[in-house]
């Protein structure tokens, strides 16, 4: 591998999420199963490597704090959206495909605990939304990291602050402007800090379309616009398909 060459990585991540909505004391909630699949490819000069497989299977629990009452299907159709806040808790498991001797893996081979609180404000009954999300992610240590003579990989907690502004153009189409600020998350190999903590700002935009009965298509684009010198340049294109029953 030519260490003077730039390193480029491409990640294709696909996730299937199945959610069961629930009634928690009159508030909307839900429990989701997340089944991810990941393809990772990297190259530098003449060096190339890739891997693919099932990533870390996860579960997501959510409960509304205010503004989101539990509704029947008939009530949901006529419900007028209002300002709301919710709590989300994601649990990532070390159940994906993992090779301890490879630095490139679909799975990270560790547990992940990630609570999120959001506040979503609408001044006009759901046509305009101003939203913020605050997430803290805590990682356990990967004690089976056997790359280049190492034995374990750890990571500091990572904080993500999101801001979103969206506007319905029609009842079926909406546009969004998005921002993400990441801080922390430095990794440690055998307790040696890797000087790769995030202090990163990403900006993006998105479009959503209600394409069929109970179904949405959402496309987002994001790009890193401010970062420490040791952090990589990054662009993300994401497409989400949702079906409600």
Predicted regions, residues:
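Outer membrane beta-barrel transmembrane domains
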Residues: 142-245
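Transmembrane beta-barrel strands of outer-membrane/channel proteins
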Residues: 31-39, 85-93, 132-138, 163, ...
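Surface-exposed loop and membrane-interface regions of Gram-negative outer-membrane beta-barrel proteins
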Residues: 2-9, 24-66, 185, 189
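Repeated loop/turn-to-beta-strand initiation elements of outer-membrane beta-barrel proteins
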Residues: 25-29, 68-71, 125-130, 172-175, ...
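Residues that define the transmembrane beta-barrel architecture of outer-membrane proteins
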Residues: 8-14, 27, 50-59, 83, ...
């Amino acid at each position: 591998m030519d260490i003077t060459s730039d390193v480029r990585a491409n990640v294709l991540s696909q996730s299937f999420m199945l959610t069961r909505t629930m009634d928690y004391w009159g508030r909307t909630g839900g429990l989701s199963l997340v089944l991810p699949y990941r393809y990772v490819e990297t190259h530098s000069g003449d060096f190339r490597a890739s891997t693919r497989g099932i990533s870390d299977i996860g579960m997501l629990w959510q409960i509304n704090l205010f503004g989101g009452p539990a509704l029947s299907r008939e009530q949901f159709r006529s419900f007028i959206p209002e300002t709301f806040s919710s709590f989300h808790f994601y649990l990532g498991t070390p159940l994906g495909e993992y090779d301890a001797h490879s630095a490139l893996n679909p799975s990270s081979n560790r547990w992940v605990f990630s609570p999120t609180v959001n506040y979503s404000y609408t001044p006009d009954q759901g046509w305009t939304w101003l939203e913020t999300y605050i997430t803290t992610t805590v990682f356990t240590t990967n004690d089976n990291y056997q790359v280049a003579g190492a034995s374990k990989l750890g990571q500091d907690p990572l904080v993500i602050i999101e801001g979103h502004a969206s506007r319905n153009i029609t009842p079926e189409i909406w546009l969004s402007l998005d921002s993400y600020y990441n801080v922390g998350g430095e990794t440690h190999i055998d307790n040696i800090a890797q000087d790769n903590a995030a202090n990163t700002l990403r900006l993006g935009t998105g479009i959503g379309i209600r394409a069929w009965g109970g179904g949405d298509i959402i496309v987002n684009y994001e790009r890193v616009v401010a970062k420490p010198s040791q952090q990589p340049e990054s662009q993300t294109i994401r497409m989400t398909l949702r079906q409600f029953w």
